[in-house]
Design a protein with these regions (language model features):
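Helix-turn-helix
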Residues: 11, 15-53, 57-58
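Hydrophobic/aromatic-rich alpha-helical bundle segments in the mid-to-C-terminal region
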Residues: 140-189
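Hydrophobic alpha-helical bundle segments that form small-molecule/ligand-binding pockets
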Residues: 114, 126-153, 173-176, 194-198
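Amphipathic alpha-helical segments used for helix-helix packing
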Residues: 95-122, 165-172
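Amphipathic alpha-helical linker/stalk segments
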Residues: 56-87, 138
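A short secondary-structure junction motif
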Residues: 61-69, 98, 114, 131, ...
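Amphipathic alpha-helical packing segments from all-alpha helical-bundle domains
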Residues: 67, 82, 93-94, 102, ...
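Amphipathic alpha-helical segments that line or abut small-molecule/effector binding pockets
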Residues: 14, 81-97, 101, 105, ...
Length: 198
């Protein structure tokens, strides 16, 4: 058996992501991935047990750096509003890149398959929204009236996914300039800040 290398693993992940984006999960075979990468199917099996395992690795690899940036934004200095704005700006910029949009389109296209949906849930950004909820809870603990941190976290997520992100996702517009994205993120936080009592 040949020695595994991180470079080959990355090459397989990048090639597979391109094929999944073009053909969807069910339209992609490991032979397709092997052709795209320029290797044998056996080589792919040396790194990944199945097509499902390969997709999970793509999702995890794609989300890992994102989660680090976002967690750092929430743990930064300043008021809750300042930290949420930094988070929202970072989040919106990260989810508007071509790779993130392609993975979201794939998730939507294959969402009728429960097993496939679970792959995305296990490897995606769900955990970061728990961090948002906890940041809001920590800052607003003891406020009167009480604040539903979970609901505010969901509202922020909906606002960030509902504007330019949705329009780009469906192909109705090109990715906006960075200043427009930053303003959109700030507006989303401003909208939920009225319910924060801070």
């Amino acid at each position: 058996m040949r020695r595994k290398t991180e470079a080959k693993r990355t090459q397989i992940l990048e090639g597979a992501a391109r094929v999944f984006e073009q053909r969807g999960y069910h339209g992609t075979t490991l032979n397709d991935v092997a052709r795209e990468v320029g290797c044998s199917k056996v080589t792919i099996y040396n790194y990944f047990e199945s097509r499902e395992d390969l997709l999970k690795a793509i999702i995890v690899q794609g989300s890992r750096p994102t989660m680090g940036y976002l967690a750092a934004a929430l743990q930064g200095e300043g008021s809750l509003i300042d930290r949420l704005k930094t988070f929202a700006r970072t989040y919106l910029i990260l989810v508007m890149n071509d790779y993130s949009l392609a993975m979201m389109r794939l998730m939507i296209a294959e969402s009728a398959n429960h097993k496939f949906s679970q792959i995305f849930a296990d490897g995606s950004e769900h955990d970061i929204w728990q961090h948002v909820r906890l940041a809001i809870e920590g800052w607003t603990r003891g406020c009167s009236p009480s604040v539903d941190a979970g609901e505010l976290s969901k509202t922020l997520r909906s606002l960030l996914h509902g504007g330019s992100h949705f329009q780009c996702l469906i192909g109705a517009q090109a990715t906006p300039q960075i200043d427009a994205l930053l303003a959109e993120a700030d507006t989303a936080v401003d909208l939920i800040s009225t319910r924060l009592n801070v």
